[in-house]
């Protein structure tokens, strides 16, 4: 695995950099020798870069269906279905066998159960994705737990055993991974919570790359709160500054990662709603200040926005060139229409798959900066924010 992009060393403040000594010399001395950094190279370096670029391809984004079984059960309950493995399998089969999905979707994040499941005809879901030119991914974190010593904040579990699990996921066909941790603005956030989130993401990213998986780095800044957009920007800049500091400390190769940030918006309970142009301006300002251009792709989460809102905001961010591929990694903002259409009825599978393609195509156009909200139905404009949302 290769190391991250480097900041120019300050040779005046550090006598030792990269195991090289810098002696201060007089003006008449010959120029100091060039510094060479040892780059860690692993067997997966080229593959990681190739995978990341494949996912960050024009007009395509990520379909996230990595909800835990409990969360998937809530989705099924909303249409009157029991939370059984058969029902979860049927829903995932509906999504992953949608004809033409690969035209708009480049990667799909799966829950562990889904990675090992197959269609009723015996074809693995991994093969369904590969045949559609979609890269299979896997959620690897083990959820959130209260962070002792913090302001009622949380930390993300799952580092124990991650290396061996990642190796198994790679053998099963996964080529990228996702780790979701959260930051709450109303809770501070505390310096402890931000550092814990950043360090955990960095360790996960390094372990993933060592095992052939492109890590999606996701410190979700929750929509909870009544704060203005300026406060969200302040917190986002702090969080991403810490994240990239620790990614570099852990020798993570920036060219072999993808980011899954929250858009910079006001808190969900703020009195004023931001326009897509304002969201784009604040979000791109944050990214340009904190994210190196070596990163190939920014795959936004929807975070409880309505389907139409998430698409409009993404479209606004693609009205001018960006240093990175700016796209989507949506769950609810792609699936909500599908569930409403399906209702668990076999005769509605085709209509449900068409509903998925409508949303996928809309976001594909938004990635290209060509989306228009004309013709969007009222259901697509309904917000999906859930306070304290858990995956």
From Swiss-Prot:
Q: Which residues carry this modification: N6,N6,N6-trimethyllysine?
A: 387
Alphabetized, the UniProt keywords read: Chloroplast, Glutathionylation, Glycolysis, Lyase, Methylation, Phosphoprotein, Plastid, Schiff base, Transit peptide
Which compartments does it reside in? Plastid, Chloroplast, Plastoglobule
Keyword Transcription listed: no
Reaction catalysis annotation: beta-D-fructose 1,6-bisphosphate = D-glyceraldehyde 3-phosphate + dihydroxyacetone phosphate
Where Phosphoserine occurs, the residues are 150, 208
Q: Where is the transit peptide?
A: 1-40
- Gene Ontology molecular function: any one: fructose-bisphosphate aldolase activity
Tissue-level expression = Expressed in roots, and at low levels in rosettes leaves, cauline leaves, stems and flowers.
Return the broad EC class.
lyase
| Residues binding substrate | 88, 178, 302-304
Gene3D superfamilies per record: Aldolase class I (3.20.20.70)
What GO biological process terms does the UniProt entry carry, in alphabetical order? Answer: gluconeogenesis; glycolytic process
UniProt keyword Ion transport present: no
Active-site residues (renumbered): 218 (proton acceptor), 260 (schiff-base intermediate with dihydroxyacetone-p)
Q: What Enzyme Commission number(s) apply to this enzyme?
A: 4.1.2.13
What SUPFAM superfamilies is this protein classified in? Aldolase
Q: What induces it?
A: Down-regulated by oxidative stress. Induced by fructose and sucrose. Down-regulated by abiotic stresses.
**A GO CC term attached to the entry:** chloroplast
**How does it get modified after it is made?**
Can be trimethylated at Lys-387 by LSMT-L, but the trimethylation has no effect in vitro.
Q: Where is this site: Necessary for preference for fructose 1,6-bisphosphate over fructose 1-phosphate?
A: 391
Indicate the family of this protein: Belongs to the class I fructose-bisphosphate aldolase family.
Q: How does it assemble?
A: Homotetramer.
Its protein name is Fructose-bisphosphate aldolase 3, chloroplastic
Please report the organism this UniProt entry assigns to the protein.
Answer: Arabidopsis thaliana
């Amino acid at each position: 695995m290769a190391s991250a992009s480097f900041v120019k060393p300050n040779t005046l403040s550090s006598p030792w950099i990269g195991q090289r000594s810098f002696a201060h010399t007089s003006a008449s001395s010959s120029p100091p020798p060039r510094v060479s950094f040892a780059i860690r190279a692993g067997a997966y370096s080229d593959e990681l870069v190739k995978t990341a670029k494949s996912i960050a391809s024009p007009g395509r984004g990520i379909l996230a269906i990595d909800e835990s079984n409990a969360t998937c059960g809530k989705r099924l309950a909303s249409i009157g279905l029991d939370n059984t493995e058969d029902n979860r399998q049927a829903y995932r089969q509906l999504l992953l066998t949608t004809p033409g999905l690969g035209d708009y979707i480049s990667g799909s994040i799966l829950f562990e159960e889904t990675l090992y499941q197959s269609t009723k005809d015996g074809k693995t879901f991994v093969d369904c994705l590969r045949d559609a030119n979609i890269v299979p991914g896997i959620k690897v974190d083990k959820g959130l737990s209260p962070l002792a010593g913090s302001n009622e904040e949380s930390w993300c579990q799952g580092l124990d055993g991650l290396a061996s699990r990642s190796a198994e996921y790679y053998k099963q066909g996964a080529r990228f991974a996702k780790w979701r941790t959260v930051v709450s603005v109303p809770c501070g956030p505390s310096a402890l919570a931000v550092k814990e989130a950043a360090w955990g993401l960095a360790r996960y990213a390094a372990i993933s790359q060592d095992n052939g998986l492109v890590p999606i780095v996701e410190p979700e800044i929750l929509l909870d709160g009544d704060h203005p957009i300026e406060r969200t920007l302040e917190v986002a800049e702090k969080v991403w500054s810490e994240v990239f500091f620790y990614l570099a400390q852990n020798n993570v190769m920036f060219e072999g990662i993808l980011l899954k940030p929250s858009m910079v918006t006001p808190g969900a309970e703020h009195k004023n709603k931001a326009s897509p142009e304002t969201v784009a301006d604040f979000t791109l300002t944050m990214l340009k200040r904190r994210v190196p251009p070596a990163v190939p792709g920014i795959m936004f989460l929807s975070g409880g926005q309505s389907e139409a809102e998430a698409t409009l905001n993404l479209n606004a961010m693609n009205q001018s060139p960006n240093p990175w591929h700016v796209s989507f990694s949506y769950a609810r903002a792609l699936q909500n229409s599908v569930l409403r259409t399906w209702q668990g009825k076999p005769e509605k599978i085709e209509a449900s798959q068409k509903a998925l393609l409508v949303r996928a195509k809309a976001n594909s156009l938004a990635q290209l900066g060509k989306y228009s909200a004309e013709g969007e139905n009222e259901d697509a404009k309904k917000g999906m924010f859930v306070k304290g949302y858990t995956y």
